[in-house]
Amino acid sequence: MKKIASFIATAILCASCVFPINMNGIKIGDGKTVKCKGPVTTNTFDLTGFDAITVNGYADMELFQGDQFQVIVKANEDVFQYLDYKVEDGVLVMETKEHVNIKAETYEMTITLPTLKNLTVNGACDADMKTGYSSGENLSVVVNGAGDFELSGIKVPSFNITLNGAGDIEADGLDVENLAVAINGAGDIDLSGKALKASFTVSGAGNIDASGLECENVSTQKSGFASIKLNK
């Protein structure tokens, strides 16, 4: 789960985080914890027609841009009976039945889609998009809880990142017109690439490192123990 455990520990201290969290397992909601065993298997879900993703609970996923939709889950066999994945109004909703908290040695997803407009996490999420993403549509990432994101080669008109809680987001090789980044709580966001206009807001104990970002029009606002580092 990469760095997510340390961020969950920090999130417990953040008033903005309202999720009951158990460090001994993936416990994000108020449902019971189920221990899932069995051989590791891979299943493909027949889900298409979405341009947004909402995670309610926990996810460890890799994201790819492609012409065809694909939702693949690799996990211990017992995990699949608890998954409740569906598409609602163009949004891929990823959650568990009765909001149970899954504890498993293996539980990871691979998602391919043509266009991603919004990624919202209500809980905790490890997410990688390292092979690049280009679109004429705006992109928004919202984390309510804890997150560890590695994003590379994002090329969109407008890119918004909002971190409410704790986490670590790295966005490298950005090529955007407008960039808006906000941290409410504790978190680190590292940015590199270029933007025509950028705004950075941090409330709490967060850090934004934009020293690798080329941008002449930048506005900043911070409070608490926040820090914002710009390219000089």
Describe the function of each predicted region.
Residues 1-232:
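Intrinsically disordered, low-complexity terminal regions
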